[in-house]
């Protein structure tokens, strides 16, 4: 299941709770066409990769989280291990998203 992050505190708690697991964060917006396009694929990945934590951040609802993470465009996918960012890319690229998960997991 993809967890919707609604505050900076919830984001920090989710990263901490993940422990050694890979955390994939989808920074998106409701008005963003490419975000809508890749969202079903992103959600399907949580079934395929049960050992990975999937988070979703709406940049309009959580502007502080997006700013802290230096998100400049949507969609942006960031990858965290043990609370530290290990990777990032922007764009609705399904192949790159899945390849990044297998690389960092």
Swiss-Prot record:
Description of post-translational modifications: In the fully reduced protein, both Cys-69 and Cys-73 are nitrosylated in response to nitric oxide (NO). When two disulfide bonds are present in the protein, only Cys-73 is nitrosylated. Cys-73 can serve as donor for nitrosylation of target proteins.
GO molecular function, one term: protein-disulfide reductase activity
Modified residues (S-nitrosocysteine): 62, 69, 73
Domain Thioredoxin: 2-105
Disulfide pattern: 32-35
Signal peptide stretch: none
Catalytic-site annotation from UniProt: 32, 35
Transmembrane segments: none
Oligomer status and interactors: Homodimer; disulfide-linked. Interacts with TXNIP through the redox-active site. Interacts with MAP3K5 and CASP3. Interacts with APEX1; the interaction stimulates the FOS/JUN AP-1 DNA-binding activity in a redox-dependent manner.
PANTHER family: THIOREDOXIN-LIKE PROTEIN 1
UniProt similarity note: Belongs to the thioredoxin family.
The protein's name: Thioredoxin
Species the sequence originates in: Mus musculus
Name of the coding gene: Txn
